[in-house]
Amino acid sequence: MSGHSKWANIKHKKAKADAQKGKIFTKLGRELIVAARAGGGDPNNNFRLKIAIDNAKSANMPNDNIQRAIQKGVGGGEGESYEELRYEGYGPGGVAIMVDIMTDNRNRTAGEVRHIFSKHGGNLGETGCVNWMFTEKGQLMILKEDLKCDEDELMLLVLEAGAEDLQQDEESFVVYTAPGDMEAVRQALLDQGIAIEEAKINQVPQNTIEIADLEQAKKLVRMMELLEDHDDSQGVYANFEFADSIDEEELD
């Protein structure tokens, strides 16, 4: 199993735990509000909103909550104005990290994110300091337990629909596309009855740094978890992988 997959497995287990606690609903709700405000309340004419609705349903967010968030976005009610920001910096071992934020108070959020970086051996940098190390990609996750065809059939389907790559970890397949091709690939999967666990625009590192020191790896995992747990965080991206010598169980 690759080092990147070790972190992917940790993230996936944590995401399921967060969904069970309902913790994820706040973040999904913000994305619904912002997507509806930016592009209108009709998902057929607003792809960002369509993806936000799909992800909310995958997390078992009640439909009433989904519709309420969309109406807040369309109606532009007071107290629901969020600013989208991206913070960039470095973590332990010189790992490049980006954090996408939705906040109603950028000064508060900046201070809290800076504190997480500095407390765990990193430092927050200037805008643009690391984003050149990443490429924007569409990403579609399919759980292996939900897949009704074999890997070769899935590979053929997504490549014919315009995907660039298909990767896998312990529990899922991940399809990568150019951002503009994600909708076509998503629709091709749905047309074949293949359930999509999550769809998003991701920032994929062009190259990765291998982390071989266990203590440094633990510090990095803790930092990433705190950034992802932050109430205003909508996405965290980094360019590391763990060496084969590091056991995933040691990082939990």
UniProtKB/Swiss-Prot annotation:
Its main location: cytoplasm. InterPro entries: Integrase-like_N, TACO1_YebC-like_2nd/3rd_dom, TACO1_YebC_N, Transcrip_reg_TACO1-like, Transcrip_reg_TACO1-like_dom3, YebC-like. It holds the Pfam family TACO1_YebC_N. It is found in: Cytoplasm. GO terms for biological process: regulation of DNA-templated transcription. GO terms for molecular function: DNA binding. GO terms for cellular component: cytosol. Keywords: Cytoplasm, DNA-binding, Transcription, Transcription regulation. It comes from the Bacteria. HAMAP family: Transcrip_reg_TACO1. NCBIfam families: PRK00110.1, PRK12378.1, YebC/PmpR family DNA-binding transcriptional regulator. Belongs to the TACO1 family. This is Probable transcriptional regulatory protein DSY2470. It comes from Desulfitobacterium hafniense (strain Y51).
